[in-house]
Amino acid sequence: MWGLCKNHFPSNKIQVQERNKALKPKKSGSEHKTKQLFPVFNCKKKEKGVMIRFAILRNANTSLLSARSICLFTQAPTYCHVRLNTLNKSITTKRNSLTESKRHVHDGKHFFTTPHQQQQTKLGEIEEGHSPNIKGEDLRSIGQAITHQRNKRRKQIWSAIFGGIFGVILGYSLIYRVIYLKEQSFLPLFPSSKIRKLSTRDLKKVDVNQVQKLSKLRVLEILSGHDMIKEQYGVPLLDKDGNSPTLNEFSMWCEDQDPCVTGIVMEPDDKRDSSHTWYRIPFVCKWRITHRPISIRGTIDDLLNRIGLETSDLFEIISPERVYGSFKYEYPLQGDSHALHLWFHGEIELDDDSLIVYNGKYHVDVKLQEIDLFRREKNGQLIQYVLYKNEAGDK
């Protein structure tokens, strides 16, 4: 074995130096550039070889290639070699870092933020629902679902509010007033007009035939003294057949003094006879729909009486119209605590082209408000002539 390796392991110092020169690596282009960039690290000391001997047993079987590889790798590195290798590694790492940073910079916004931070921001936007990949149809469907849910919630709230109010009112009117206290209760529904027709019950208390006769006499009396009627129709006033004029149309209605409402009247089911038509709920109550006025002054009086006061203690209302024809002296229907105006309307036909129309109020006597003559002239025009009008009357 020693004979095979004697060329690689010289015996004297001169041979060692020559061997080191032969094994000294040649300068490459990269190393030459490195020495130019870093001249401080130029090695001036001579390289020294290292003599290593291997003791191999005689009986051991070792191939020639193994022995040659051992001889080649026994050359120990010098200080300059180690330093050059370190510098080469540092330069390559710097170049790699610069190339990687250049690859990451796509536009100017990465000078102050790294791509990693931008990726985290995009992920956060996607989690919040601001992803650009979401379609417009999906956004509209989401918006419609939110709007539908809000409307549904709003309807539930309003239904609960109105249901609670209706339950409180119905419970007080029906359960407390009618069933518990055994009293009459009125539940208002909606406002109604002051003017209404006389009911069957009201007509029983008013003599309509008497009002009709009195109104006709008052109209003929006023027309007989009118100059136009005297000249064109003559006195006494007669119809086309030469008879006294007759009423073709006559009607009456009432007008309440206060605002009116339409509502439901409820009473205990006592099965007593009544002039009104009632609808019954067996063993609970009876009810009907009616009109009732709302007396503001009466409501104020009731509130003051509950706290021990009266209206006269605070103020006094003085009406300047304390004369016949005001509401104070109008016809009160039986069973009502408020005054009413009883109005009437009539038509008297004089001939085919002439018609007398009048209206007024009734209390104890008839009080006419207006008398008009409707006549069709020869040219075919229908003209209204106002023959009488009560300017001081309340309409």
UniProtKB/Swiss-Prot annotation:
Origin: domain of life: Eukaryota
Topological category with respect to the lipid bilayer: Single-pass membrane protein
Major place of residence: mitochondrion
GO cellular component assignments: mitochondrial membrane
Keywords per UniProt: Membrane, Mitochondrion, Transit peptide, Transmembrane, Transmembrane helix
Subcellular location: Mitochondrion membrane
Spans through the membrane: 156-176
Family: Belongs to the AIM39 family.
Identification of the protein by name: Altered inheritance of mitochondria protein 39, mitochondrial
Organism: Saccharomyces cerevisiae (strain RM11-1a) (Baker's yeast)
Lineage: Eukaryota, Fungi, Dikarya, Ascomycota, Saccharomycotina
